[in-house]
Amino acid sequence: MMLLRSALYGLFLLVTVVPWALVAVTYSVFVRGDRMYWLCVGWLRLATWGAKAICGVRYRVTGLDHLPSAANAHAAVLLAPKHQSTWETFAFPALMPHPLAYVFKRELLWIPFFGWAIGRMDMIHIDRGRRTAAWAKVQREGRRLMAQGHWVIMFPEGTRAARGERGEYQTGAARLAVTTGTPIVPIAVTSARCWPRRSWLLRPGLIEVSIGRPIPAKGRRHDELMREVEGWIEAEMRRLDPEAYPAQGGRP
């Protein structure tokens, strides 16, 4: 049954993304910025809803009150979530009250229809093989987008980690936060419970998203700041999904 539901969900994504992306690409000729962003987020909301309706993937979010309110549209924050699956890539723009600017590898732009649409959005796509140029672009574009009220989102581990595992936390998000004096918000997410990495077989269940309090970055050392972010995320992951982690011992 899971295989059938997952296949139906994949078909649902394919059938809906093609017309939505074509509309978005056409629309982008005339309109960019926030209106373009929210048009594309409409499909991400549909994708998140489809995972629930077809595959039984539910979610619960706590800590939204830790984020700036809609009345404070230009209060910039930098989001630093745990990265376990494709789910948070789809869901976070649908869950957050302000436009998000993802930092992502440029290869995603090559995905037909989906990549064409995100290429028209105010995001930061980088060549991970050119680290110096990539960081310069993140710093430059991050400043610009946060000044416009966007929230930059960077996955500190850089790539998806399997359930119960801890990836190597990179300091890029902390460096950007320190450079711009922007608070960094750690986020724990248990998406691998339902949507494991490198898999399109979705399991019914509940994904927990826990948003931490913003951590001030001004005047901090980026390595020390990232250790604090990592410590909060990993401790919260153990609290939310204890069966995925060893009962005793250190780093999983």
Question: Where would I find each of the regions flagged by the language model?
Answer:
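N-terminal membrane-anchoring alpha-helices
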Residues: M1-R60
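Non-catalytic C-terminal accessory region of glycerolipid acyltransferases
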Residues: L3, W135-P252
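Catalytic core of membrane glycerolipid acyltransferases/transacylases, capturing the structured
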Residues: A21-V41, I54, A71-R131
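Active-site phosphate/pyrophosphate- and oxyanion-stabilizing loops and adjacent acidic/basic residues
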Residues: T48-W49, F90, A174-R175
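A short, well-structured juxtamembrane/interface segment
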Residues: G50-A76, P246
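Short acidic-hydrophobic, aromatic-tinged amphipathic segments that line or gate anion-handling sites
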Residues: V61, I124-D127, A217
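Generic preference for hydrophobic
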Residues: V61, L79, Y102-V103, V209-I211
